[in-house]
Amino acid sequence: MRTLTGTGPDLWNHDGGPWGVSDLVGNAWDWVSGIRTFNGEIQVIPDNDSAMNVDESPDSPCWRAVLEDGSLVAPGTPGTLKYDAVAPGTDSPEDIGIRGGYRLNTEIVNFNYTGHEEDISHRAYGWNFFRDLAPAESVTVPQVLKLLGAAPAPGGCSDDSVFFLRNYGERIAARGGSWFDGPWGGIWELYLRETRAFIYPDIGFRSAWADV
């Protein structure tokens, strides 16, 4: 079944009412601000400052990494949380998927891509169900990552939402899945596979009206 954007019943809106947000799941991936990965390290813009007109460029000083206790620190600080691949990566220059998924870790044991191509935008990637994203042994996942939807909350991710990632280079977040995903689209679906220059028919964004 197909529906036009925003034309579903009120029950499909986030609050079940006529003024709720529609199409949070499916339709198109939504680019979101304030969260990214850089070489697998999870980085955020603190205090919801990304809702303002702040610098979110690749080298912005606003980005912060996350420690196990939830502290926000400078990117590259030892012990910050990262998305580490479970399976070894590949040096193949092809855009191939690597099975095994990811774990939250304080170091990167396995990058998806281990080659030396200058353009790393579309090399190897991985995926797993978001609910299966677990910490490595002895690693603590802070509440802030669960609140940001960057790590699953216990008992809160029962659907088949998928987590996609390339844990090398800068990757910008999109959420919610698209019409391509079918039953795997879900509210927890998180897409950290592409660069900020990526364009595709099933990736969009949510605009906001501003009185200027």
Segments (PLM) and residue ranges:
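Short, low-complexity, polar/charged sequence segments that are solvent-exposed and flexible
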Residues: 49-51, 193-194
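A short, polar/charged loop-to-alpha-helix boundary motif
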Residues: 38-48
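Internal maturation/activation junctions in enzymes
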Residues: 1-5
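C-terminal, surface-exposed recognition/capping segments
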Residues: 6-7, 15, 22-24, 28-36, ...
